[in-house]
Amino acid sequence: MSLTNADETVTYDALIVGAGVIGPCVATALARKGKKVLIVEREWSQPDRIVGELMQPGGLRALRSLGMIQSINNIDAYPVTGYTVFYNGEHVDIPYPYKADLKPVEKLPGLVRDGNDKVLEDATVHKKDFEDDERERGVGLVHGRFLNNLRNICAAEPNVTRLQGNVVEILKDKKNEVVGAKVDVDSRGKVDFKAHLTFVCDGIFSRFRRELHPDHVPTVNSSFVGMSLYHAHMPHDMHGHVILGDKHMPILVYQISPEETRILCAYNAPKVPTDLKSWMTKDVQPYIPKTLRPSFDDALAQGKFKPMANSWLPARQNDVTGLCVIGDALNMRHPLTGGGMTVGLNDVVLLIKKIGDLDFSDREKVLDELLDYHFERKNYDAVVNVLSISLYSLFAADSKNLKALQKGCFKYFQRGGDCVNLPVAFLAGVLPKPLLLTRVFFAVAFYTIYLNMEERGFLGLPMALLEGIMILITAIKVFTPFLVRELIG
């Protein structure tokens, strides 16, 4: 089917700008609800990107709700059953939560059918393991292959029309309400396409997020440098690895296929060093676990570095009639916790529950529901987003108090029980309780203060009390402003 023949004489129910992870999910869900959908993407060929390679259990649960879980099949996706956190040579294993402790996965009417909420059997994803494991699972995957699967599921829907072109303008009427988009299409030029509701899903580098507000732009304070490791010997199979220490920035390692492992090395500035190889050799290589060193050293010698900026962007209300901004175009968090796709996919689930059965030509009714949607999404959105930025502050500790909190956090994990069960449930995107997150974060802070007092001893108590006050103030600074912004903004 041609990707340039979309009919501009039709008023579509929904026009979707962008076919990254979120766009095809919105398009598929709305099409299954009977909506006539046009989805526009600049380039439909498989991309090569290092974002969106780790899907937390909360994201997989959302794919099940949408009837799109089979998008992880037949792409050599690699199961993830939990995390291993390293700190100055010690480590602690943190498995994902038990399924019995969570609510059953919600099956959205009209979307889940014919077993499309269950994984298929393939070379790396074993149906029995995913469906019958007593614990939740995540998955590491090659982003481009996953995206192709999502796009193919979307393309199979008869109510979806795909268009390859560059969206150059969001169209508005005399009342300043959004009525569609102008698309530059090969061999056709600039064409106006009309729709009752236009979805902006154009991702991290969104051109159109500022249609909500001119100030809706992300903040960038840090970076990651990525490399591909091949045939790496992971310290713990089927685990994501977080490598911490008081002398280096956080290092993330997770397998994305049987052959390929992604390593992401944090750098605490918006722009990475000019001489990346020297920086990696000096500030990263000495802290890589022994089993990973051969594959790391090979990758370092090849010098194929992939830098990426880390953005933070709190969500704004979708208060423009005829417009819905969703995914990374709306809301971003630090990628340390791998929660981006989880938030975006849960947004799609909630969105479909709110507006999937509405008549989109009733634009005021749709707008009312979108305003409600903004507030209903805050619980899970706030947990994943605030956790990402506060954990990064601790794990990338650049002050005495933050280093104390970093050590205290690791020691807290070592206690086991709820000291790991609750944090990993937040990380997995399956415990949308921001007040409980607050309690756990400050439990870590007070445990850090206790450890410091114990280390100081009786004679050092006055100094320990002063340091405790400073540690508590630091904890408040790295957590509270972000929580308030997410919940109240």
From Swiss-Prot:
Mode of membrane association: Multi-pass membrane protein
Coiled-coil regions listed in the entry: none
Domain of life: Eukaryota
Cofactor needs: FAD
Name of the protein this chain belongs to: Squalene monooxygenase
One Gene Ontology term of the molecular function aspect: squalene monooxygenase activity
Binding residues for FAD: 21-22, 41-42, 49, 151, 167, 328, 341
Keyword terms, alphabetized: Endoplasmic reticulum, FAD, Flavoprotein, Membrane, Microsome, Oxidoreductase, Transmembrane, Transmembrane helix
A single GO BP: ergosterol metabolic process
Organism: Candida glabrata (strain ATCC 2001 / BCRC 20586 / JCM 3761 / NBRC 0622 / NRRL Y-65 / CBS 138) (Yeast)
Catalytic activity field: squalene + reduced [NADPH--hemoprotein reductase] + O2 = (S)-2,3-epoxysqualene + oxidized [NADPH--hemoprotein reductase] + H2O + H(+)
InterPro entries: FAD/NAD-bd_sf, Squalene_epoxidase, Squalene_monox
Primary enzyme class: oxidoreductase
Protein family per UniProt: Belongs to the squalene monooxygenase family.
Listed transmembrane segments: 10-30, 426-446, 464-484
Chain's role: Catalyzes the stereospecific oxidation of squalene to (S)-2,3-epoxysqualene, and is considered to be a rate-limiting enzyme in steroid biosynthesis.
Pathway noted in the entry: Terpene metabolism; lanosterol biosynthesis; lanosterol from farnesyl diphosphate: step 2/3
Main location, first listed in the record: membrane
Subcellular location: Microsome membrane; Endoplasmic reticulum membrane
GO cellular component: endoplasmic reticulum membrane; lipid droplet
Positions bearing the site annotation: Important for enzyme activity: 83
Entry annotated with the keyword Transcription regulation: no
